[in-house]
Amino acid sequence: MTAIVFDKVWKEYGDHVVLERIDLTIAARSFLALVGPSGCGKTTFLRLLLGEEKPTRGKILVGGKPLKAEPDADRGVVFQRYSVFPHLTVLANVMIGREFEQSCLMGKLFGARRRAIEDEARHLLEAVGLKGHEDKYPAALSGGMQQRLALAQAINRKPKILLLDEPFGALDPGIRADIHVLIRRIWNENELTVVMVTHDLSEAFRLGTRVIAFERPRNRPEELERYGATIGEVSAQAIVAASGASITQDFEVWPRKIANALPDPDSRPDLKIAPTNGAKPPG
């Protein structure tokens, strides 16, 4: 079953091409990890999926239908910096999305409906390891706990797609490992398709069922803005074979090693993108 399809998608800002002819099919329930150097279009790709940006050309389908222009309950998102409401308690942070969804009176519910949403929120907070912190404010939580809260917010409306924009970048290694376990559990226990941006290759291969690399392999300084990032599916074995390096190294330290593991678009003028759905290149 297909969850998301990018059909020849381009994203341009005037003469600046950010993404170039993206053809990508993402299966339902998959965990897609996106890697690549800064400025290569990973976050733009995520913003397209979230509905914050529109393709310049091409189309995006979700569940076989055109992507809705505005973010909705089907798409949850967690950013690198904790996207929580500082003036609300932990419990209220989780409840607020459902309250706005179901209430037509200033986002507030009362009586049985409010109790039902509160019970669900408490259960979710327990599931992400925040039981006992319901009445605290985000400022009283550690970084890892705030990210757990952001995850609870993101999945509270039972989305079909969870978007993660470098969600672990601000956490220390020990806390990151704990959140990795939590993310995998959430993904396994829910009907979720996950798309995650990360700069950490080992994290990408540890969590993802697929790893997609964004790269601008052409070297034409005079036409730098005329080419957008292409994508290609890459394996840990391909990276090691191309570079002789361990995938535990940080991506920003050695971005070219991903490029060495990908096809060279300039060698195939007719092929702007490495196929990612198992199809063979034309020709």
Regions found by a protein language model. Give the residues of each.
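The feature captures the beta-strand-to-loop junction immediately N-terminal to the Walker
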Residues: 35-37
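Helix-to-loop junction immediately C-terminal to a conserved catalytic motif
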Residues: 50
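Conserved ABC transporter NBD signature motif
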Residues: 58-70
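Conserved ABC ATPase "signature" region
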Residues: 95, 107-133, 185
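Conserved ABC ATPase signature
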Residues: 137-141, 145
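A short, proline-enriched helix->beta-strand linker immediately N-terminal to the Walker B motif
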Residues: 156-160
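Catalytic Walker B motif of ABC-type/P-loop ATPase nucleotide-binding domains
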Residues: 162-165
